[in-house]
Amino acid sequence: MTLPNKLTVSRFALTAAFLWAMFSRSPVNDTLALVFFCLAGVTDYLDGKIARQRKLITNFGILMDPLADKIMTCSAFIALIERHVLTPPPVLHLGELSLSPKVHAWMVVIIVARELAITGLRLLAASKNVVLAAERYGKHKTISQMVAIIALLVMDASAEWWPWLKAALLPWGPWFVLLALWVTLLLTTSSGALYLWRNRKLYLQDV
């Protein structure tokens, strides 16, 4: 197994470690969750970079790298729903609509549905001996998801070790989280729609 593929596989293990930390009763569980998720993000950056530099791109990596990303980010969003049961104070009011820096269930439904649709398309392509690689705008989507998740984790972990940081984040931290979540939602839906449109011949010919 090549080094990039080992890094990709390690992301599955780091995702499991992240979920354990999220739901453990350790006094530093938020910090551990943040560390594990950041390490998983580093492997996502390194596996692609090393594969391109050393010309170690394989069909395994093309398929499993985006799958590892999807499992990592979707697991994190679902876990954050479980953790953030109480809605924080809203930071923006639009008439009767109040927006809070929280991962809502309907957001995760959209994100997971998009990822399942793209995974289904890749499986359909594989059945036709076609390998669909991740595209640049898909990577931008993944980065935006990671930024939103890390922002939420930092807000939680700061209460364990850095009370001064939590106090410093209060004026603008919730605004950043809210913006990151909505940017993530926009990139997730738009990139998914564009990917399905560009590869429409794969599924339209079977309709």
Name the predicted role of every residue range.
Residues 1, 12, 62-65:
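Hydrophobic alpha-helical transmembrane segments of integral membrane proteins
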Residues 10-17, 68-80, 114-119, 141-153:
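Core segments of transmembrane alpha-helices
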Residues 51, 77-81, 121-125, 196-199:
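Hydrophobic alpha-helical interface/terminus motif in multipass membrane transporters
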Residues 1-5, 14-15, 34-37, 41, ...:
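C-terminal membrane-associated helical module and adjoining short loops/tails
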Residues 16-63, 74-84, 95-112, 172-189:
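Membrane-embedded alpha-helical segments that form the functional core of polytopic membrane enzymes
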Residues 81-89, 157-159:
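Juxtamembrane "helix exit" motif at the C-terminal ends of alpha-helical transmembrane segments
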Residues 11, 109-132:
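Cytoplasmic juxtamembrane interface segments
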Residues 87-99, 164-169:
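Intrinsically disordered, low-complexity domain-flanking/linker segments in eukaryotic proteins
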